[in-house]
Design a protein with these regions (language model features):
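ALDH superfamily catalytic-core signature
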Residues: 2, 9-149, 169-172, 211, ...
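Short beta-alpha connecting loops at secondary-structure transitions
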Residues: 36-40, 103, 161-163, 225-233
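A structural signal for short, well-ordered beta-strand elements
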Residues: 43, 164-168, 190
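Catalytic cores of nucleotide-enabled group-transfer and carboxylate-activating enzymes in metabolic
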Residues: 52, 59-60, 175-178, 195-205, ...
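Conserved glycine-rich beta-strand-loop-beta hairpin in the small C-terminal domain of fold type I
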Residues: 136-140, 154-161, 181-186
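Bilobed periplasmic-binding protein-like "clamshell/Venus-flytrap" ligand-binding domains
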Residues: 126-129, 183-190, 206-213
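Short, conserved phosphate/pyrophosphate- and ester-handling motifs at nucleotide-, phospho-/glycolipid
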Residues: 75, 159, 193
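Phosphate-coordination loops involved in phosphoryl transfer and adenosine-cofactor binding
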Residues: 96, 299-304
Length: 401
């Protein structure tokens, strides 16, 4: 049994709080909640392909996909050429009735959405916009100029793309900025330098990565879909852990051992100490896909796991064995709400409802309360990586014997 939801982060948080009042505390919420999805294009990318993928990712379905591209970074060496090609491609888009075969982009969902997006565009620096029909709930595909993802106040659910150029020496900073926004659903990267691709894959914190292709759409069994942080709780839809999350749980049994009392600041210091030697993850698993496409499934341990209850010490040892940063503590509800960042809480004991309520009152990402005897399964974050191997000159593995 569980609750499954797709929608906004705020609505997911509201559902989580209601669940603490009306359902047993061990019932999971599986939320998939969108995000500020970014793409980076470096100077080695095939511009024609990158432009096509940007058009599809940002404007298809009128930008009304949780996976849609919102923030585009282009290396400054090619930024002007890229903009010329992008704006030219946008001029060719047909906006109108989606029942017409020649139409590329239809309306947004309702007038309220149209008014909100229009007001947002009017308050910002427009680099380029097409022309939309005067009647109906249409929004012209628009590109806005920003300095980076930190300029985006929220997700704008429509055909609006934010554009910024960057110096390649600042690539690590750009990735930190993207990770720092708290969302982590989809991310795209266009580059023909494999070392750089692997570096970005290792640093970016999102659920679904797309290399040298568009970043919308996911195939069940090949690209399990779902985000991290403000973008979702996991497990991924279409992945091996989704259905088992709804199965009946065997709850943890308390052990006669009480952990040390700790304040929020002490818990934070303990996490920071463990993070210096945290395990980065296991070898990726190859998933099926067509020729010219490499699909990989990665499992990485959740970074900050707080273990509570009489058996917290044993629970923490089990979490540490997976590579998590795990702390066993006896902590008040007030201090539990004050710990800056938590990825999961594991608990065995009689106060589960109070703990679930304290966790639901936190701002930011939804923190799962794990009470299952096999809780280790849910301490691993899933990532899907999809690589178009044709973009870098073909699949070199085909040449190997």
């Amino acid at each position: 049994m569980g609750v499954c939801f797709t929608g906004s982060t705020k609505t997911a948080q509201a559902i989580n709080r209601l669940m603490t009042q009306h359902l047993p505390p061990h019932i999971p919420l599986i939320a998939e909640t969108g995000g500020l999805n970014a793409m980076i294009v470096d100077s080695t990318a095939l511009l024609e392909q990158a432009v096509q993928d940007v058009i599809i990712s940002a404007f298809q379905s009128a930008g009304q996909r949780c996976s849609a591209l919102r923030m585009l970074y282009v290396q400054q060496d090619i930024a002007e050429d890229f903009k010329d090609m992008l704006f030219g491609a946008m001029r060719a888009l047909c906006i109108g009735d989606p029942a017409e075969a020649a139409c590329d982009i239809g309306p947004v969902i309702n007038q309220a959405s149209q008014k909100k997006i229009t007001r947002y565009i009017q308050e910002r620096h427009v680099l380029f916009a097409t022309i939309a029909p005067e009647t109906g709930c249409f929004i012209a595909p628009t590109v806005l100029s920003v300095t980076g993802i930190q300029d985006l106040p929220e997700e704008i659910f429509g055909p609006v793309l934010h554009f910024a150029s960057f110096d390649i020496k600042d690539l690590d900073r750009v990735i930190r900025d993207i990770n720092g926004c708290g969302f982590g659903l989809t991310f795209g990267f266009h580059s023909r330098i494999d070392e750089r691709v692997q570096r970005v894959i290792s640093q970016i914190n999102v659920g679904n990565l797309y290399i040298n292709r568009n970043q919308i759409g996911a195939v069940v069994g090949s690209q399990p879909f779902g985000g991290h942080g403000l973008s979702g709780t996991g497990p991924k839809a279409g992945g091996p852990r989704y259905v088992p999350r709804f199965a009946k749980q065997t709850l943890l049994q308390s052990a006669p051992c009480k952990p040390s009392k700790m304040k929020a600041a002490q818990v934070e210091r303990a996490f920071q100490h463990q993070e210096q030697t945290a395990f980065s993850g296991s070898k990726p698993i190859n998933l099926p896909g067509p020729t010219g496409e490499l699909n990989q499934y990665h499992l990485t341990p959740r970074q900050r796991v707080l273990c509570l209850g009489p058996g917290a010490e044993q629970l923490a040892k089990r979490a540490l064995a997976l590579g998590c940063c795990a702390i066993a503590a006896d902590i008040s509800s007030e201090d539990l709400s004050a710990v800056p960042q938590l990825d999961a809480v594991v608990y065995s004991g009689p106060d589960a409802r109070h703990i679930r309520k304290a966790l639901s009152a936190r701002d930011g990402a939804i923190v799962p309360l794990l009470m299952d005897e096999t809780f280790e399964i849910w301490l691993m974050k899933e990532r899907s990586v999809c690589i178009d191997t044709t973009a870098a000159g073909g699949n070199a593995a085909l040449l190997a014997s």
